[in-house]
Amino acid sequence: MNIVVIGHGMIGHKFLEALSAHTVPDLTVTVLCEEPRPAYDRVHLSSFFSGTSADALSLVPEGFFDRPGWTLRLCEPAVEIDREARMVVTSAGDRLSYDRLVIATGSVPFVPPVPGRDRSGCFVYRTIEDLQAMQAWGRTARSGVVVGGGLLGLECAKALRDMGLETHVVEFAGRLMAVQVDDGGGRVLRQRIEDLGVHVHTGKNTLEIVDGESSTHRMQFADDSWLETDMIVFSAGIRPQDALARLSGLDVGPRGGIVVDDQCRSSDPDIYAIGECALWQGRIFGLVAPGY
């Protein structure tokens, strides 16, 4: 049996661990990983800024892929799924046949469509490479802004504080973690965050990002106020990475996500989807816990 796995994040690797515990005759497993390193712990990604190395964050024991028929291809994402031929085309142009295909592409950061969002010094907070780029830029920066006041945004704000930057959080809603807490909880949370030395700006709609006068950037808000900063990190939520599924004609939800049944099968019985890219019973779980 040929199994191809697209994606090697936390849930993709958890699947491989489970698969490795079973004896399957004549099994070949090919894992296509977009990133330059095997799966690592994204949950504790912020610890990278307090000294945890990339190797220490790895979830893959040495020798894990030293199994007959198992292959990990780094920096080689899938670019096409040919369902009729049951083939996956990789970025290197290789065509891989499969008996079963597992899509574990996870999610991608949502970046608000703000003019100037692609300026140098603007980042997303998702991969170790993102963090390395932030760290390099932060060596000459004095201040940083996190766009997004959810849980991940607050974690990112801690990372900027750990880098020694004057840190701001800009949130569109009227309170931090607006989905998780009510107004009273939001007031308590805001006070706690400000007590940690982080400046909080709620109810702010960013219209554009332009050159600053005393800093690299100026963020212009809809209420005519503005904020200058040397670096900006977008942490405004995630979206399921389902582009391949859409291109191949698999069923996806109205707001994204590959539709799966209780066995994680997609609308094609030979293709499965797991993790943050999957939509089960109308729900997308934007966290790894259900996969564990």
Where are these regions (language model features)?
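Beta1-alpha1 glycine-rich phosphate/pyrophosphate-binding loop at the start
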Residues: 1-71, 157-180
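Glycine-rich dinucleotide-binding loop and its adjacent helix/turn
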Residues: 105-163, 260
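N-terminal Rossmann-like NAD(P) cofactor-binding module of classical short-chain dehydrogenase/reductase
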Residues: 102-103, 233
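Phosphate-coordination loops involved in phosphoryl transfer and adenosine-cofactor binding
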Residues: 2, 75, 140-143, 203
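Residue-level detector of alpha-helix initiation sites
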Residues: 10-13, 36, 107-109, 129, ...
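FAD-site-proximal beta/loop scaffold in flavoenzymes
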Residues: 118-140, 218-220, 226-292
